[in-house]
Amino acid sequence: MQRDPAGAPRPAGASAAAPDLAGDPAFVLLGEFGRAHGLQGEVRLKSYTADPMAIGSYGPLTGANGRAIALTALRPASGAPDMLIARVSGVSGRDAAEALNRLALYVRRECLGAPEDEDEFFSADLIGLAVVDAAGTRLGTIRAVPNYGGGDLLEIEPTGGGAAALLPFTRAFVPKVDIAAREVTIDPPDDLFAPAKPSPEDEV
């Protein structure tokens, strides 16, 4: 159900006049910077494209602060398949890289084209959508759309707090996706947010 969307920055964060790209349908969220990596200006980058490295294929992106962000180098980071180490044009030291922390990156929607089928969605479009049940009760928020080899999953952060849960992104579990309303309707198993059971080794 998922389709992969195959000037120096001033990383001081958004100003009072910064655009609200999160609510602008002309832009699609592709990733978010994390903490600085090392001393040479590298920074961790969480990619929301199905192929994480594809985030580097769109040319300069637009930061949530409205400024152009040019990724000059990318490589996989250890620990998570969607985490990268990035170099950014104009960022050469740790302090400048650290100033990028939590800066969201967007691309204009026309750069992505359009999904071919009605049940295909850009993974980046799903990030941040509200998750509700058939009665309309808010259950959580989509934080990621990982795929570990067995099919697309929705990583859902529960509304009441606690550990995120993974739900297969199939029509059986996700009967409705409403991008315009910014919500998905799910038919979850009863134990979706249940704490993980301890392994036999933990009980010894």
UniProtKB/Swiss-Prot annotation:
<feature type="domain" description="PRC barrel">
    <location>
        <begin position="117"/>
        <end position="192"/>
    </location>
</feature>
<comment type="function">
    <text>An accessory protein needed during the final step in the assembly of 30S ribosomal subunit, possibly for assembly of the head region. Essential for efficient processing of 16S rRNA. May be needed both before and after RbfA during the maturation of 16S rRNA. It has affinity for free ribosomal 30S subunits but not for 70S ribosomes.</text>
</comment>
<comment type="similarity">
    <text>Belongs to the RimM family.</text>
</comment>
<dbReference type="InterPro" id="IPR002676">
    <property type="entry name" value="RimM_N"/>
</dbReference>
<dbReference type="InterPro" id="IPR011961">
    <property type="entry name" value="RimM"/>
</dbReference>
<dbReference type="Pfam" id="PF01782">
    <property type="entry name" value="RimM"/>
</dbReference>
<dbReference type="InterPro" id="IPR011033">
    <property type="entry name" value="PRC_barrel-like_sf"/>
</dbReference>
<dbReference type="GO" id="GO:0006364">
    <property type="term" value="P:rRNA processing"/>
</dbReference>
<dbReference type="GO" id="GO:0043022">
    <property type="term" value="F:ribosome binding"/>
</dbReference>
<dbReference type="InterPro" id="IPR056792">
    <property type="entry name" value="PRC_RimM"/>
</dbReference>
<keyword id="KW-0143">Chaperone</keyword>
<dbReference type="Pfam" id="PF24986">
    <property type="entry name" value="PRC_RimM"/>
</dbReference>
<keyword id="KW-0698">rRNA processing</keyword>
<dbReference type="GO" id="GO:0042274">
    <property type="term" value="P:ribosomal small subunit biogenesis"/>
</dbReference>
<keyword id="KW-0963">Cytoplasm</keyword>
<dbReference type="GO" id="GO:0005737">
    <property type="term" value="C:cytoplasm"/>
</dbReference>
<dbReference type="InterPro" id="IPR036976">
    <property type="entry name" value="RimM_N_sf"/>
</dbReference>
<protein>
    <recommendedName>
        <fullName>Ribosome maturation factor RimM</fullName>
    </recommendedName>
</protein>
<keyword id="KW-0690">Ribosome biogenesis</keyword>
<comment type="subunit">
    <text>Binds ribosomal protein uS19.</text>
</comment>
<dbReference type="InterPro" id="IPR009000">
    <property type="entry name" value="Transl_B-barrel_sf"/>
</dbReference>
<dbReference type="GO" id="GO:0005840">
    <property type="term" value="C:ribosome"/>
</dbReference>
